[in-house]
């Protein structure tokens, strides 16, 4: 199951910076985190699903790059997001 539109809208609503925000780093990182958490659970039960594992690793790398960008540009927003999502940094 991919991220359904209702769940995606909830995430966007929680992390948006302004009214029509869908592409800020915070929103992108939050959506990726939700997808990563889902895929992690999926891979615990389907250990041989290598296609999904590769997709998971790509998402983790993309999230890492977005987090590095946010940390480089605005450290306060980075710290707030990391604590809200419960990520290690």
From Swiss-Prot:
Gene Ontology biological process terms, A to Z: translation
Alphabetized CDD domains for the sequence: Ribosomal_S15p_S13e
Keywords: Ribonucleoprotein, Ribosomal protein, RNA-binding, rRNA-binding
Record PROSITE patterns: RIBOSOMAL_S15
SMART domains: Ribosomal_S15
Gene Ontology CC annotations of this record: cytosolic small ribosomal subunit
GO molecular function, one term: structural constituent of ribosome
Quaternary structure annotation from Swiss-Prot or TrEMBL: Part of the 30S ribosomal subunit. Forms a bridge to the 50S subunit in the 70S ribosome, contacting the 23S rRNA.
Job of this protein: One of the primary rRNA binding proteins, it binds directly to 16S rRNA where it helps nucleate assembly of the platform of the 30S subunit by binding and bridging several RNA helices of the 16S rRNA. Forms an intersubunit bridge (bridge B4) with the 23S rRNA of the 50S subunit in the ribosome.
Family under the similarity heading: Belongs to the universal ribosomal protein uS15 family.
UniProt name for this protein: Small ribosomal subunit protein uS15
Organism: Heliobacterium modesticaldum (strain ATCC 51547 / Ice1)
Chain's gene name: rpsO
